[in-house]
Amino acid sequence: MPRRDDIRSILIIGSGPIVIGQAAEFDYSGTQACRALKEEGYRVILVNSNPATIMTDPEMADTTYIEPLRAETVAEVIRRERPDALLPTLGGQTALNLAVELSEAGVLEEYGVQLLGASIPSIQKAEDRQLFREAMERIGLRVPESRTVRSVPEAEELAERIGFPLIIRPSFTLGGTGGSVAEDLDALRASVRDGLDASPVRSVLVERSVAGWKEFELEVMRDLADNVVIVCSIENVDPMGVHTGDSITVAPAQTLSDRQYQSLRTAAIRIIREIGVSTGGSNIQFAVNPEGDDFYVIEMNPRVSRSSALASKATGFPIAKIAARLAVGYTLDEITNDITGATPASFEPALDYVVTKIPRFAFEKFPGTSARLTTRMHSVGEVMAIGRTFTESLLKAMASLEIETRDIQARLDEPSPYRIFAVFEALRAGMDIPEIYRRTSIDPFFIAAAARIVAAEGAVEETLSAEQVRELKRMGFTDEALAACSGYPAEVVRGVRRALGVHPTYKAVDTCAGEFPARTPYYYSTYEQEDEVERGENPSVVVLGSGPNRIGQGIEFDYACVHASYELKACGYDAVMINSNPETVSTDYDTSSRLYFEPLTAEHVLEVVRRERPEGVILQFGGQSPLKLARELERAGARVLGTSPEAIDLAEDRSRFGRLLRELGIPHPRFGTATTAAEAREVARRLGYPVVVRPSYVLGGRRMEIVYGDEDLELYLRSSVSGSPEHPILVDKFMEAYVEVDVDAVSDGEEVYIGGIMEHIEEAGVHSGDSSCVTPPITLTRSLQERIEDYTRRLALSIGVVGLMNVQYVVRGDEVMAIECNPRASRTVPYISKATGVPLARLATRVLLGEKLRDLGPRPASSGSFAVKAPVFPFDRFAEVDPLLGPEMRSTGEAMGIDPTFGGAFAKALAAAGQRLPESGRVYVSVADRDKRAAVLIARGFADLGFEVLASEGTAGVLRNNGLPAAVVPKIGEGGEDVLGLIERGGVDLIVNTPWGRGSRTDGYLIRRKALMHRVPCITTLAGAAAALQGIEARIRGETRRVHSLQDLYAART
């Protein structure tokens, strides 16, 4: 069928900020769709609130709105742009839910907007648990015994009939949000209440648990002519009961018989037809009885999903790109497979390799919370590896995780992060395969593979022969693993391996198991004879990606890597990407000239460098992971482009950096280092409390804390870290009541371009990644900004920075102090690039290639609007965690608000981050003693806006003494309706609560947790409360209803 000519413009809704369950895979999918539709000649309009995405780059769509993903905002975009169609299947659950909301509100009908990809009835049939169950029964497929309930008593009634355990699955949610396993009546009541709160339609499915059965997923595509293809089968190593996003998964499925696979395949085709997804992709999940052939249908996602991205990377079949073309009328047989250039998309991919995905977790950021894995997703990222066998891909994936395995404490009989390591330990201890299977329900096939690895470990000899090394490498053993088995250092093993002439070859991902030659250079390493790499005629430059997403190192760094790749190609170089993250745009097969899906270890990177012989290697865009390899690459003779490893060390070594600041006459907070607990106490007393304590060389504020006295310091030293000469404890004077400032800059070694100055909204003490910030600054005078720019230039030139750098300062009054310098891309690079219109990573890439800033002449758009970045947190996923901000980073993503006023931008950013400020109602204020005086102005501001002010007894007394009436709310547990009761019954609309005690049982902790559970905005800093006041004023004035495209903003401000 020809492409549709009755539509000219298409609106795409993105997925918003990175959250657990909805991450970088939707930037990858959305970017593919935007490009595909523009190539077809359609006008593409994009709405997304996440500035760290490639899809929100102004060239990806014709019109780009960085606005909150709320129905009223998207409706305003529709009113302004009048698109002919809406494609909602590429923005995750967020976009799907918005499409339903817009349809039910009559917006799509009012403006004549057609829905592409999936109809409203098909979305509802797939997402509403009861409708889905009825649909499956209609076509004769079994689902676990279940019932959709809308109240706790209904769930209790079902439990009496079918017993425990039960699975709770809310409707229209993502990543298992609100889902759980209930083992008894009390757990059921709590779980159903949580699930009803999580579901936008307040319904949950309560179903009989099939925990222990095997879980499989099929990625299915269908076109308007009713052609259906199965793109990929995926098997979960962990059994049912663990969310698929938290399970190790393998593609293609390894333990299905042909009969079982054909049964699932037939069922999947019947399901996609029954649900009515007429064009595009869907993910369908099954539970298969490990003792037979019977199976249940678990659920279906009628859209591109997290597994779709994995399947695309595993097979080379670009699901999102093809889904976009199917949505505008093409059929599968009319679309050419980009990988081969010779086969149509109606050919199902065939794999002659095995792909393994392992999730990456961040439980260490949330101490005190249970690490037991359930149906609610907890992982923050993932790695993928490709090998010729399952063992090879598993060991490569384990090497890609970038975790300290000695810190892992996993139990065999409890689903937990990295349980695979417990399986290995059990095998090493002599436990047999049947016993491990009994304890884990992991299929014996996978346990046997682990047993072969353990047996090979034991057979490693002190003298390694070429054949033995080659065989072990074929199994997937890294040089580090061989070193651990043989007792030699990894460098020695590497030297022996090279002396024996044992090197990897590289195979292409071609979608057809070698039947047709691959045109797109997408490679993985293995130890076989034939090498399939075809180098181009252009000189090449290697870009190291950032590896798995994690808190502190997320999509922002992938954004910089993608920009580097684009710019290298624009400058006539072959861009060679090395990365292990299947979610991201950087691992799309056509982002770079050649893609190597490999772990970011010295061994794997050096082998690619050996094969490619590049002009240089770029490390500075991928965060801390690539920087750790700088010295080893330099020793191996690789040319590191940009800032030298020596300069990197100068900036990151606290003592050396402190000496440099003193030489330059740049003020800085007093600090000290300690190698023992006693030294830490001595340094803290010398500096004077409060102090900030942390280990050296950390990312994302890991194990960083503000301590206010000896007792706090003792608790920190006992629970968190102990110093040593190799890893000293850093102790800094904490700068109370200072404002933190971030600066992103590019240096060519002679000149420095200041990309932007960002003022944090929270005071110093909150990690920069967790603080909201605004550019241009709102309280810094021009003279202060000039001094900050001067300090930044002097630091860049003195350190020897070539490329990107980020400097952090604290400011109070007329005082400016430097606190940190990172000679690499920062997490604010995408945000400041979107705010100013200057793509800093592209500019830095040109500098790395030897060009000069004076010739490039970057020109930011003159300031006409404020841009606010607001963080997004996963606190709802981690029970018992205090949602209090501090020096350790815990946010997973960010949203951005743009408006001519600061208040409007801040309100938009908060709304986009999931915190909608109320325009009226009741505000509860309860602050620490040190904040009570300043809280008077805040409370008066709310009263002036018409809010009723409620307060704790102590805070109310101060407010009344200053002439401000405030109703006293009783202390928790002392009779009468306390604030917890008020929150539960919806009697408070906004909370301002600053901490006043250490530990998890203070009243403040209980208030913050209860507010989180009931989605009441809770602000934990007075600076944040002051900004919220301005945001509420902007909402009342109607300023947040206006929308602005990036293209219009840039055109108006140049």
UniProtKB/Swiss-Prot annotation:
InterPro entries: ATP-grasp, ATP_grasp_subdomain_1, CarbamoylP_synth_lsu, CarbamoylP_synth_lsu_oligo, CarbamoylP_synth_lsu_oligo_sf, CbamoylP_synth_lsu-like_ATP-bd, CbamoylP_synth_lsu_CPSase_dom, MGS-like_dom. Mg(2+) 3 binds at Q808, E820. Binds 4 Mg(2+) or Mn(2+) ions per subunit. Its cofactor is Mg(2+); Mn(2+). Mg(2+) 2 binds at E299, N301. It is an enzyme of class 6 (ligase). Residues 403-531 are annotated as: Oligomerization domain. ATP 2 binds at R694, K733, E740, G765, V766, H767, S768, Q808, E820. Its EC number is 6.3.4.16, 6.3.5.5. Residues 915-1054 form the MGS-like domain. Mn(2+) 3 binds at Q808, E820. It catalyses: hydrogencarbonate + L-glutamine + 2 ATP + H2O = carbamoyl phosphate + L-glutamate + 2 ADP + phosphate + 2 H(+). Residues 133-328, 658-849 form the ATP-grasp domain. Mg(2+) 1 binds at Q285, E299. One of its GO terms (cellular component) is cytoplasm. GO terms for molecular function: ATP binding; carbamoyl-phosphate synthase (ammonia) activity; carbamoyl-phosphate synthase (glutamine-hydrolyzing) activity; metal ion binding. Residues 532-914 are annotated as: Carbamoyl phosphate synthetic domain. GO terms for biological process: 'de novo' UMP biosynthetic process; glutamine metabolic process; L-arginine biosynthetic process. Gene3D superfamilies: 3.40.50.20, ATP-grasp fold, A domain, ATP-grasp fold, B domain, Carbamoyl-phosphate synthetase, large subunit oligomerisation domain, Methylglyoxal synthase-like domain. Mn(2+) 2 binds at E299, N301. The large subunit is composed of 2 ATP-grasp domains that are involved in binding the 2 ATP molecules needed for carbamoyl phosphate synthesis. The N-terminal ATP-grasp domain (referred to as the carboxyphosphate synthetic component) catalyzes the ATP-dependent phosphorylation of hydrogencarbonate to carboxyphosphate and the subsequent nucleophilic attack by ammonia to form a carbamate intermediate. HAMAP family: CPSase_L_chain_A, CPSase_L_chain_B. Large subunit of the glutamine-dependent carbamoyl phosphate synthetase (CPSase). CPSase catalyzes the formation of carbamoyl phosphate from the ammonia moiety of glutamine, carbonate, and phosphate donated by ATP, constituting the first step of 2 biosynthetic pathways, one leading to arginine and/or urea and the other to pyrimidine nucleotides. Belongs to the CarB family. PANTHER family: CARBAMOYL-PHOSPHATE SYNTHASE [AMMONIA], MITOCHONDRIAL, CARBAMOYLTRANSFERASE FAMILY MEMBER. This is Carbamoyl phosphate synthase large chain. It comes from Rubrobacter xylanophilus (strain DSM 9941 / JCM 11954 / NBRC 16129 / PRD-1).
